Amino acid sequence: MGKGELELAGFILSEAFDEKAEKEKVEKEKALKEKTEKEKAEKEKAEKEKVEKEKAEKEKAAKEKAAKEKAEREKSKSAVSPATTNQNSNKGNVEKGVAIGVLAGGAVTGVAVGGAYLADKYIASKAAGAAVNVIELTPIPNAANTANNAAAVSQGSHRWQPLPYYLFNI
């Protein structure tokens, strides 16, 4: 073998080794890249699961809080006594009674329709100078109309006289 042939064989071998080293380098880079991508995907998946878990816990806590508040509201509703409920509804009855009674011309002090709530105490606090203390839902004639009303009742009808304009504080 001549010198030129040896150089050529050495060159071919070095090229083969270089090619092999290049292939190994590319494979290592590819494996490293795949490993990095896999770790990144696992990390993202773990982060996503963590976020979903936190979200589920927050929703669960919100539902429990809402249920607790609802139970407390129901409990407080049931704690209101029937007397208080009647009292509140009687306030509305008193106001209706005043309106109906003033228009019909009857005024009387006493207990409002509906029972337990003393209407004169309620109206006295709301009256602000009004002449009428309490009006029942069933109008009672004022003194000026008593005779006319008695005659009308005896005839089978109940006719009311109009109220004087000065009672309305216009």
UniProtKB/Swiss-Prot annotation:
Keyword set, alphabetical order: Coiled coil, Membrane, Transmembrane, Transmembrane helix
Cellular compartments per GO CC: membrane
Superkingdom assignment: Eukaryota
Membrane association type: Single-pass membrane protein
Keyword Metal-binding on entry: no
Record's compositionally biased regions (Basic and acidic residues): 20-77
Coiled-coil residues: 15-81
Subcellular compartments: Membrane
Cell wall biogenesis/degradation keyword on record: no
Stretches the record annotates as Disordered: 20-95
Chain segments annotated as transmembrane: 98-118
UniProt feature, compositional bias: Polar residues: 78-92
Designated name of the protein: Putative uncharacterized transmembrane protein DDB_G0293028
